[in-house]
Each structure stands twice: as structure tokens, then as C-alpha cells.
């Protein structure tokens, strides 16, 4: 690229002399790709029966997931996103989750009131049914300090078959690794309208010989967040102005990282306070219903 500038010339004939500087414009390969709500989840087999014996009529297949919420900040919200192909019930920390899980659709289950700091144990219970059935799930934990952690179904969700619900006072078969199956053909079409996600891949040498790189983002939605791993790196409330993000101004380095961009609607009772204008008037934005 070529840029022009003017230099003051002194002497007998003072004036401004035009100069030019030539520089190479770096080619940035920062890729952004949409991310499905259950894209990273493995699909686990809940049934594969061509006939159920009479003694198995009351049997259920259980899936167990132990997880630790050890972030020092208080828990703000815990949400389970689950797509099962058959009915199931949920239990978290020895308490049955009083929310219906509907088959053949994406369920959003609020687990906030059941979760606790430290070790948690979640299990899902599926009755034996004929045919092949499967499910996928994802848990997102939000903290008041704006950190976020999540996990999805994988081979760590141990499973066992039994005729009664597990409890501390009852012996039941030792859980084993689940059967991981191929994603169904409709998996890519599973969508969630409250928020959408994208992956942002930053090259490892993106900032080499540069002071900064700016991403300029225009989006449709009420709020946007960028996560670097589990930590909130930047956010923006949509005021219909271009959101400018300086990659070298983030608290933690983003070079060589995969960032997550989240854009979502606000709750109906959410309030946004913008910067105080010059005349001292207070601006308050309430999300439309």
C-alpha cells in the first residue's frame, strides 16, 4: 500500500512538500464459522432393542455425569440443553428435576436451583423402548463474575441398566462407558433462537510486527459477548453502532486461540445503562417484550 503525507519545507521557499511511504499490508486470516447448539456434543445410545423381555419392562438406562463447579464466583445460571429421541427424567444431586423433558426436540432445562458449588452429580433416566434411540446434551454454567464453563455429552457420561433408580442405599450395576453413535441426519438443523454462536480462529502470529488488530462487528441482536476459553473477554450492548474489538487490548492473549462469539436476545426484564451523555441525562434501555 502507498500512503501520502506532507512535510514542512523551510528556507527561501517554505511550504509543504508531498511525500509518500510504501508499506506491505498484512493478510489476516481470521476465520469465523457458525457453531451449532449441540455441535460439540457426542450422541449416546439410549436404546437398541428389537424386543424387550418381560423382566425388563421396568428397566431403565441411566447416564451419570459428575462435574465440579469450583469457580470462586457465585453461580448465576445453570442450563441444560438436551435433545432426546425418547422420554427421560433428570436428577441432580439426589433431587428430581421438576421439568418435563420432551422427546424429539431441543429442551432447555433450568438447573440453577439444583446445582451447588463443588461436586455435582447429574443423571438422566431413559425407559427401555424398542428400536434405536439416542440423545445429546450440553450444560452451560454462568457465574456472576462473567466467567462461563460448559461441557457436553461424551464418553465420560457413564451408563448402566437397572430396574430401579440408583440411590446411596441400593446396590446397582457398575456404570460403564456409553455407546457413542453417529450423529443423526437432522443434527445440523437443531437450532436455538435465544442465542447464536460463532467460532473465531485467531492465527498464532496474528499480531507479529503489529501494534493491534481491530475487528469491527455489526450484528443483529441485543447483546454480544466474546469468550476466550471460559473467560469473558469483551462484550457489547447493541446501540446500532459498529462494535470495535482490539485484539491486543484483551486481558489475556488471543493469538492462536479459538474465541467464541455469542449473540443473543435479552430477557424481557433486562435493563441496560449506557454511558452518561454530556448533558447529564440518564439513559435507560429496557429490552422490548
Question: What are these model-derived regions, one by one?
Answer:
Residues 116-118, 255-257:
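A glycine-anchored, Pro-Gly-centered beta-turn/N-cap motif
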Residues 124-130, 263-268:
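Short beta-strand-plus-loop segments that form exposed binding edges in beta-rich domains
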Residues 285-289:
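Conserved small/polar residues in nucleotide/adenosyl-binding loops
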Residues 57-69, 192-204:
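Short beta-strands within extracellular/lumenal beta-sheet-rich domains
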Residues 108-112, 244-251:
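Exposed aromatic-hydrophobic patches
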Residues 63-65, 105-109, 243:
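Short strand-edge motifs at loop-to-beta-strand transitions and within beta-strands
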Residues 1-35, 60-66, 83, 125-127, ...:
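Mature extracytoplasmic enzyme cores
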Residues 17, 67, 71-92, 122-125, ...:
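Aromatic-lined ligand-binding clefts that engage carbohydrates, nucleic acids, or primary amines
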Amino acid at each position: 500500500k502507498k500512503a501520502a503525507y506532507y512535510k514542512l519545507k523551510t528556507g527561501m521557499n517554505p511550504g509543504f512538500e508531498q511525500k509518500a511511504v510504501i508499506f506491505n499490508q498484512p493478510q489476516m486470516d481470521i476465520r469465523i464459522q457458525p457453531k451449532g447448539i449441540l455441535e460439540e456434543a457426542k450422541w449416546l445410545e439410549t436404546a437398541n432393542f428389537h424386543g424387550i423381555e418381560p423382566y425388563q419392562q421396568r428397566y431403565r438406562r441411566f447416564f451419570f455425569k459428575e462435574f465440579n463447579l469450583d469457580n470462586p464466583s457465585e453461580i448465576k445460571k445453570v442450563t441444560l440443553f438436551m435433545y432426546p429421541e425418547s422420554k427421560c427424567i433428570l436428577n441432580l444431586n439426589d433431587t428430581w428435576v421438576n421439568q418435563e423433558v420432551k422427546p424429539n426436540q431441543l429442551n432447555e432445562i433450568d438447573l440453577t436451583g439444583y446445582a451447588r458449588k463443588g461436586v455435582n452429580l447429574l443423571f438422566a433416566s431413559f425407559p427401555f423402548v424398542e428400536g434405536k434411540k439416542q440423545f445429546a446434551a450440553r450444560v452451560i454454567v454462568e457465574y456472576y463474575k462473567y466467567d462461563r464453563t460448559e461441557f457436553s455429552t461424551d464418553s465420560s457420561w457413564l451408563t448402566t441398566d437397572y430396574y430401579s433408580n440408583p440411590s446411596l442405599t441400593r446396590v446397582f450395576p457398575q456404570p460403564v462407558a456409553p455407546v457413542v453413535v453417529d450423529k443423526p441426519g437432522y443434527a445440523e438443523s437443531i437450532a436455538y433462537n435465544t442465542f447464536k454462536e460463532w467460532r473465531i480462529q485467531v492465527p498464532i502470529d496474528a499480531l507479529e510486527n503489529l501494534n493491534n488488530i481491530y475487528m469491527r462487528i455489526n450484528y443483529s441482536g441485543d447483546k454480544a459477548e466474546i469468550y476466550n476459553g471460559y473467560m469473558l473477554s469483551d462484550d457489547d450492548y447493541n446501540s446500532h453502532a459498529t462494535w470495535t474489538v482490539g485484539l491486543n487490548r484483551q486481558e489475556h492473549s488471543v493469538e492462536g486461540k479459538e474465541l467464541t462469539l455469542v449473540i443473543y436476545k435479552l430477557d424481557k426484564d433486562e435493563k441496560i445503562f449506557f454511558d452518561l451523555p454530556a448533558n447529564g441525562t440518564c439513559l435507560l434501555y429496557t429490552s422490548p417484550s
